Amino acid sequence: MSFNIKEISEMIEKQIRNYNKEVVQTEQGTVVSVGDGIALIYGLDNAIMGELLLFSNNVYGMVLNLEEGAVGSVILGDETLIREGDIVKRTNKVVETPVGDALLGRVIDALGQPIDNLGPIDFTKTRPVERVATSVMARKSVSQPLETGILAIDSAIPIGKGQRELIIGDRQTGKTAIAIDAIINQKNRNVKCIYVAIGQKDSTIVQVVEKFKKYGAMDYTVVVNAGASQPASLQYLSPYTGITIAEEWMESGNDVLIVYDDLTKHAVSYREMSLLLRRPPGREAYPGDVFYLHSRLLERAARVNENYGGGSITALPIIETQAGDISAYIPTNVISITDGQIFLSSELFNQGVRPAVDIGPSVSRVGSAAQIKSIKQVSGTLKLELAQYYELESFAKFGSDLDETTKATLDQGAKIIQMLIQKQFNPLEQVDQAILLLTIKSHLLKWLPLDSIYNFKHEILSHFKNDQQAAKLRKKLDEQKTFDDQLQKEILKQAQKVVLKITKNIKEYKPEAFGNITEYQNLGK
């Protein structure tokens, strides 16, 4: 076989002449070590913080550590598919989540993927999960009430749209119940809701979703679930996914309520990742930036002015305490970030007071500006009366020699507590709350025995809905949202009828001992 050197040289020359220089640049690195949801990668010198990385087998990771010569990444998927020596590619993108109305009624994971077996989500837009909080000049002061339907909260610890109100208490004190009630009460109020479950049992989430479906709340709610079976990276990411979905609605002019259940587990998942990434531990082994972890999340909840959409995000973060210790690291951090807290007491819970709101240490720093006038008129002395009751109650245990004023204060306080007891999934309209609070303020309860207070509450609400004259007064109060002297007197006359009806049916009970109810002078004052 002979070779024609001339033909070969011409062929090579032709190929050289037709050669087009195209450089396709892809940055890739190699997995040095992997374990516990963390991968150490060599060779990605230009990776940026929070960037999405693509491992082999289509598993994604997120950059959280930038070290000299290596990159620390958390794995957002099944780490068992990753081996040492695997190739890792940069995507030049950060983590994004789908947003928009297509998410309503769905249960999604921290990456925005549906996990409710209802098929894919038909979304048209995504947003990066990390974003700088709304600027000061874009914000608007809180002035509209967010109605929870819970008498103890709406009267003494009111929440406004755009506020961050912490729900804090020991385990099994009804923290989630308050948040669920608040979401259920938003039905027909044009408020979209997001429930973020962090580190919860899957069985618990199923129960919550079933409750939402039962009361029609899933029509305006999206559930973001990063359960206890999910890796720490997804538990860490889930609240940011939730607030990103909320921001899209806020900028479209909608009011949004978001619940984080709970941020204690969120901090624990971040601590786990930080320790595995070899970051220096601080107090309680949390990393130094654990305050920033929650502040950058909660500062994204706001009420914005019309130039930025005119919507609002109201946040209800939940924190679980150990033995009522609100001075621990994470509770104090979140208390200092939020605009107030609802403190739930295990002692009250065990006494049968549900919701177990301890009104003493509970406070709402900005919500009072959002309270409607009718409730503000009749709830002003509520906290003071309860504070006096709790103070006197502790002294009353030591002796039975009490003067009449002290006895009256103790009696009124005990009856107020009974009035504030409310069953779950039974939210109250604001007009009904105003009527109940008026009966408390006017000391009408002194004609009733303690064990008939709960019945009185049910009867008076029923009376103002079913009695023709009382229903007209209720409607008038609902429309004008304030008490004038005449309306107040007429409502209390109707309330007197209910008191007389109840006391008449109690054997051997003499309400005359407290004076003539029809001639009582404090009514209406």
From Swiss-Prot:
Q: Which CDD domains match?
A: ATP-synt_F1_alpha_C, ATP-synt_F1_alpha_N, F1-ATPase_alpha_CD
**NCBIfam families from the UniProt entry:** atpA, PRK13343.1
The positions annotated as site (Required for activity) read: S362
Residue positions annotated to bind ATP are G169, D170, R171, Q172, T173, G174, K175, T176
- Name the InterPro entries for this protein: ATP_synth_asu-like_sf, ATP_synth_asu_C, ATP_synth_asu_C_sf, ATP_synth_F1_a_nt-bd_dom, ATP_synth_F1_asu, ATPase_a/bsu_AS, ATPase_F1/V1/A1_a/bsu_N, ATPase_F1/V1/A1_a/bsu_N_sf
Q: Which UniProt keywords apply?
A: ATP synthesis, ATP-binding, Cell membrane, CF(1), Hydrogen ion transport, Ion transport, Membrane, Nucleotide-binding, Translocase, Transport
Q: How does it assemble?
A: F-type ATPases have 2 components, CF(1) - the catalytic core - and CF(0) - the membrane proton channel. CF(1) has five subunits: alpha(3), beta(3), gamma(1), delta(1), epsilon(1). CF(0) has three main subunits: a(1), b(2) and c(9-12). The alpha and beta chains form an alternating ring which encloses part of the gamma chain. CF(1) is attached to CF(0) by a central stalk formed by the gamma and epsilon chains, while a peripheral stalk is formed by the delta and b chains.
| Primary site of residence | membrane
EC number(s) for this protein?
Answer: 7.1.2.2
Top-rank taxon of the source lineage equals Bacteria
Question: Which protein, by its recorded name, is this?
Answer: ATP synthase subunit alpha
Q: Which GO terms describe its cellular component?
A: plasma membrane; proton-transporting ATP synthase complex
Q: Does the keyword Magnesium apply?
A: no
**Record lineage:** Bacteria, Bacillati, Mycoplasmatota, Mollicutes, Mycoplasmataceae
Q: What does this protein do?
A: Produces ATP from ADP in the presence of a proton gradient across the membrane. The alpha chain is a regulatory subunit.
- Which reactions fall under this protein's catalytic activity? ATP + H2O + 4 H(+)(in) = ADP + phosphate + 5 H(+)(out)
Q: Which residues cross the membrane?
A: none
How is the protein disposed in the membrane? Peripheral membrane protein
Entry GO MF terms: ADP binding; ATP binding; proton-transporting ATP synthase activity, rotational mechanism
Query: Which HAMAP family would you find in this protein's record?
Result: ATP_synth_alpha_bact
Gene source species: Mycoplasma capricolum subsp. capricolum (strain California kid / ATCC 27343 / NCTC 10154)
